Each structure stands twice: as C-alpha cells, then as structure tokens.
C-alpha cells in the first residue's frame, strides 16, 4: 500500500505539471512511450511494471517493502 501511495503522490505532480501540458490523453494511451522523465517512469511502475530500467528499479524497491 505504501508503494502505491508514494507513486500516486508523484502522479499528479509530474502529470499535471509537465505531462499534462503535453497531452495527458495520449499519455494514458501510450504513457510508456511518452514517459521520459523519472517521475513519469516511476508512476508507470504501477501500470507497466518493468517497462524501463529505471522504472523497474523503483518498482522493485517500492514493492520490496
């Protein structure tokens, strides 16, 4: 639960600030491809686990708890 909560808190920040401006709709469809920032990648950890190397590391650490 902690892992999800942590990622959720990061979600609105990176999404509303940077990604939201670019196009939040496209990110929902192809978020894995559009995600370039560490914030977006960490958020994708919940949806597309093990999509990016950095994403996988963050997911592993969070899920480890």
UniProtKB/Swiss-Prot annotation:
Gene Ontology molecular functions: RNA binding
Spans annotated as Disordered: 1-41
Domain of life per record: Viruses
Pfam families, alphabetized: Tombus_movement
Keywords: RNA-binding, Transport, Viral movement protein
A GO biological-process term: transport of virus in host, cell to cell
Quaternary structure and interacting proteins, as annotated: Homodimer.
Protein name, UniProt field: Double gene block protein 1
């Amino acid at each position: 639960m902690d892992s999800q909560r942590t990622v959720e808190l990061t979600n609105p920040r990176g999404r509303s600030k940077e990604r939201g401006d670019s196009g939040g709709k496209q990110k929902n469809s192809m978020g894995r491809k559009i995600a370039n920032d560490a914030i977006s990648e960490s958020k994708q950890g919940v949806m597309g686990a093990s999509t990016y190397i950095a994403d996988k590391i963050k997911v592993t650490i969070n899920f480890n708890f």
